[in-house]
């Protein structure tokens, strides 16, 4: 895995797939934001949070980066508790 600091061993298939997707975004800044968050928090996310994380990974990098770093306000359907955890985790 590109950049991941943890082993995917012991993670279920869904979490392993999300870990790979988080680290292989296409925009290096988002690799670091989402990949580091996934390394640290993915194993402990609930099923609902995993679903939310999957939806966040579908958002184009440029848009997600603007929301994460606060240059644009995230829409209400994106500004979930999980999104706020990602923003708090990322030092912007």
For the regions a language model picked out, list residue spans one by one.
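Positively charged, polar, low-complexity stretches
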Residues: 2-92
